[in-house]
Design a protein with these regions (language model features):
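Residues that form generic nucleotide/phosphate-binding pockets
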Residues: 36-39, 71, 82
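Alpha-helical transmembrane segments
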Residues: 50-57
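A generic structural signal for nonpolar/aromatic side chains embedded in well-ordered alpha-helices
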Residues: 68, 86-87
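Well-ordered alpha-helical segments within folded domains of soluble proteins
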Residues: 98-102
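Alpha-helical transmembrane segments of multi-pass membrane proteins
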Residues: 57-67
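Active-site-surrounding "flap" and adjacent substrate/cofactor-binding loops of secreted or lumenal enzymes
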Residues: 77-84
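Membrane-interface helix-loop junction between the first two transmembrane segments
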Residues: 65-75
Length: 254
């Protein structure tokens, strides 16, 4: 089964929904998609600083790839193996979380929860688009398949050449960014970022990715979540629904 089936199922239901909240969410989702597609065309001078910092972070981590791989593989333990094996199911859990959050909010008529689910799905979709495109374009060999961090085979769909960037990490940081922006409670913020960081570390520990893959994935996810959270459709106030009051008219009979 497709690992992202829960999210695809959710999007299908959202786009076919006919209730008032779903119609509103459908229009907001279309607005988000349109703006996300044209966002690269609006790149301007203020974007150069975060871009430069991101490229510097990825480049710097590249020179630490082998050291971090050696350190992580030389310090494996049976207990840590069991703990970090959980990342195997993370993508399915993340996709299901987005869908379940949305439909719970819809069923409970909870606007904030419903919109959180929609934002999680939008962030998931945005980072996945960037992540899958880069994997195909870069074609970097995974550490488990080769011995060098500079082995590239662009436009290769083989799993062994889909190392850059880390998809698990980009997913984790996209969801963490949305959750952190959605809550004022410091405990939830710390939990979200801590779990995202643990997912990133697990990919290195399990020898699935180089450090620079994880750094790139974290940055992609973070900026995807920030874009979603700042989008105009996600910063507006809840709509006001007017419920008609039933009137009773009595006519006295003489």
């Amino acid at each position: 089964m497709n690992r992202r089936f829960p999210l695809l199922f959710f999007l299908a239901l959202l786009l076919s929904g006919s209730s008032f909240p779903q119609i509103q969410d459908k229009e907001d989702f279309k607005s988000f998609l349109g703006d996300a597609l044209i966002a690269p065309a609006h790149f301007d001078s203020k974007d150069f600083i975060p871009l430069g910092v991101s490229l510097a972070a990825i480049s710097g981590s590249y020179f630490l790839d082998h050291q971090i791989k050696t350190l992580s593989q030389n310090n494996r333990t049976p207990t840590a193996d069991k703990i970090f094996a959980a990342d195997k199911y993370f993508v399915e859990i993340a996709a299901s979380l987005s869908a379940l959050t949305y439909f719970y909010g819809l069923a409970a008529e909870n606007y904030k929860t419903r919109r959180l689910g929609l934002k999680l799905a939008e962030a998931f979709l945005l980072q996945a688009t960037a992540m899958v495109s880069l994997k195909f374009l870069v074609g970097r060999e995974r550490p488990a398949s080769g011995t060098s961090n500079d082995s590239f085979n662009p436009f290769n769909t083989s799993w062994a050449f889909t190392s850059f960037p880390s998809g698990h990490t980009s997913t984790a940081f996209a969801l963490a960014s949305v959750i952190a922006n959605d809550t004022d409670q410091i405990g939830w913020k710390i939990t979200a970022w801590s779990l995202a960081s643990a997912i990133g570390f697990s990919r290195i520990y399990n020898n699935e990715h180089w450090l620079s893959d994880v750094v790139a994935g974290a940055l992609i996810g973070y900026f995807a979540g920030e874009f979603v959270s700042a989008h105009k459709s996600n910063t507006q106030s809840p709509p006001v629904q007017i419920t008609p009051i039933p009137l009773s008219v009595s006519i006295p009979l003489n």
